[in-house]
């Protein structure tokens, strides 16, 4: 039986030797069950005679563009290299594309570097083919099965290379890298494939007879398989009495039609294993035997008679049955299984049941505990055993002529599992969803033995993880959008990293510090030759020396080209989700900003008090002119092109409506931050950002109502604490009435404040 040929991901678009990014990195890694077909031609298209694109597969996940460049640049000038990665996790998909400037270098790399070890794994190189129709064609594709486990890609390639030009060669492997016993060889022509089948089919490879034939697509195999199932002739019989002989077994089924073979399965000692097979000459005879003999009792045992199935077919059927049963259990107990955590160590199953029994009928209640594997022999027994051994040694020294006494038999140490310390959480399953909902409402945050309980509906670990990842991703997206909107910049587009060779666009010559081996991205600033990595190429606005910083100590912008002062909140927290910008922060003493960093731009559209100059420095560009003494505050009109933001004190709906939406959040954040900082100094920035997701009218109400603000701060703090505590924890699935330990969360739980 063969497997379907999987398709090779599309290569980069190549224009004048420079690849354009495609969506190949966004695809998930396909399951490797077959050879990845290459182009049926050995050279790239005629429209690009001076370029050659190679597909490099079987790569270790840790392989980078730089490693591949070091290897492939030894052949010739490399135009570009890209390792394809998952769009979300950015993990390597195990393959890459290498583009040369000319076809000759690509041919030489294919010949010299194929199956070269990279990070201990032999890479597989072939021409990339962007046309999916050519990649999926089965012409010239040969399937080989019954391969010895020692045969790898290179050995298979060497065996079949004598019959024609091989485009791709692969031995299928499992997730552990072990051979599955079959492989594929894709020839350039159908004649070469026929020649290989003719000469190798039935031969011995490593003392194993191999089958070689044309590859059949999965679609064709499936239709053929369905036809075979509908016209089966082989019958499987089990629950056969061990006293039944082969002759009796055959006579049991002879009345249904001509039998080509009938056999009972026996062990090494010749005893019947209780099952056997009967193959009829026609499908009608086999169907009649199944209809009449199934569930028939013979010699006190009820027979099972049905169509004989292959192992993989039975496994797939069992897997489907298990999945259906699992989904049925999950739906049955949906909404009735509760997860309870923050339990004290003295709470056991009975006490947990007592706590929740007033809310309805409980089908099961369980506190999860550590399991300790130990032996039955106690420590005291071990000490007694050591003492007796010492006495025997002394007696042996004193009476050497006497034979030592036979030692008593040691007690057998049988391992057993005992329940240990409570993990601090458990599960309670009710008989109805209404009872469970009532228990959640009443028991969540209730103090039990000095600790507030956390009670919620139990979720499967994978469901909870996916929900958490989705919420984090959505929150990060909102932060990026708000940061870009606050800076007045378009949304950043992060292009996949591409490694360029010397002479290509975006390449920084070797030996120059501060360069980056990637194409310049939108919003990125390249380092200047001879400068520090990330140094801004040119003086920063308003940076003319001064006390706070030397004239050459430029502050580099971040990856979006926004000055760092406009993107940071208190304590260096990135101002990505409306965190208040520290316009009022002064480094040093005095309202005039004696110790303020010269040239550090304030947040866009923000002017803090004492917006002046550092001692001995030039005036900050776009700021007020000095009015005399050092560090004195001065008032001046805003610079051209910059909007003036009204003061944050006494905010009203009319005031907010007069400014753009991004600045509305900014003003609200600056007004909220001091109030929140008074309550939670360490997490003021995070809590402010969380509250800024609320509606502006609600935020205005919080500014006027201290009690409401304190309640919202406590609520945000509890949400943040739950997020931090649940990072490494998992909740058990509601698959059965009795919660399972294998889906439990970790043991350690902190007390809630």
Curated annotation (Swiss-Prot):
Extent of Gly residues compositional bias: 605-631
Biased composition (Low complexity): 37-52
Highest taxon of source: Eukaryota
Location of this chain's protein in the cell: Cytoplasm; Nucleus
PROSITE patterns: PABC, RRM
GO terms for MF: mRNA 3'-UTR binding; poly(A) binding; poly(U) RNA binding
One annotated GO biological process: regulation of translation
Ranges of biased composition (kind: Polar residues): 1-26
UniProt domain PABC: residue ranges: 648-725
Alphabetized CDD domains for the sequence: RRM1_I_PABPs, RRM2_I_PABPs, RRM3_I_PABPs, RRM4_I_PABPs
Cited function: Binds the poly(A) tail of mRNA. Appears to be an important mediator of the multiple roles of the poly(A) tail in mRNA biogenesis, stability and translation. In the nucleus, involved in both mRNA cleavage and polyadenylation. Is also required for efficient mRNA export to the cytoplasm. Acts in concert with a poly(A)-specific nuclease (PAN) to affect poly(A) tail shortening, which may occur concomitantly with either nucleocytoplasmic mRNA transport or translational initiation.
Name the UniProt record assigns to this protein: Polyadenylate-binding protein, cytoplasmic and nuclear
